[in-house]
Amino acid sequence: MHKDTPMSTVLKNFLPHLGRLVIVALLCSLVLGGWPRQGKAAQSVHSSYWLRSGIEQLEAGNYQQALQDFNQSIERENNLALAYSNRCLTQIYLQDYLHAWQDCTRSLQQQSDNYLAYFHRGLAFYRLGDYPQALTDYNQTIRLKPTYYQAYYNRGLVQATMKNHPLALADFNQSLRQITNWQPDALATIYNDRGLSHLALHNFTSAKADFNQALRLNKNNASAYYNLACTAHQLGEYERSIADLNRAIAIDPFYADAYIRRGLLRHQLGYYQSALADLNQGANHLYQQGLHHNYRQILALIEQIHQQLLSLPSPIV
């Protein structure tokens, strides 16, 4: 098929995915650094309740209740730096990135050396697409807390998003060096994302080594199998790519991109009926996940394949 057809256009939209530990890493920062210092906790027992309750609600995933509790804490002016910082994080979980940025800025006005506020604000900027400002905040986080592996990891994600893959590799390497406790899930995610930067630089051997290391650390890492499949696809190893996609789908039956890439591969190999089945399944998952633009792309591709099949003289597989 010609390189400018919708088939190749769709394939570009289902390249390997950058990791998603950015928010997960923040939970670690909340638990480890989110409590007031003991010297300040006795200022107001009543106000301290709202701050602690907000943190507990945030950890439990009750974001609206956490927001209300942090509002109460802020109204009582109890430990404003911490309350604003954690309300910033709550806004991030609620995908209200503008208010998150504002709250973290307020936190820093109260306490200019609050590395968590820089860290959280960096994520808000990242989600708003302001990558240079996100880098600035992660740089400041690292200046204040040089051993904070999450900051190196997040900065690496920003560099990778900006296609600065050599710099991303340096940050992922530093993140791995800074992890002092055995955290297999976090390690697996970092190896997986370092592998993506290697893959972007066509360092296929290093990419595969990182994806396999991610799987040794977490055998249920569907993303690592997907990325191995992408590597095999780029190397022209189509059957191996399909085998890795099969594993990814077995782990995550709702993995829309895995169905779609497998469908594209099967189409490429001439297995048209199974390709259509995969593309339809992937399209359904995209729709259910609210990714309507990609959903319409896949529907257009399915229609294109149907039209292509009508012109084939021989029975289809």
What is each PLM-predicted segment?
Residues H2-V317:
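Alpha-helical tetratricopeptide repeat
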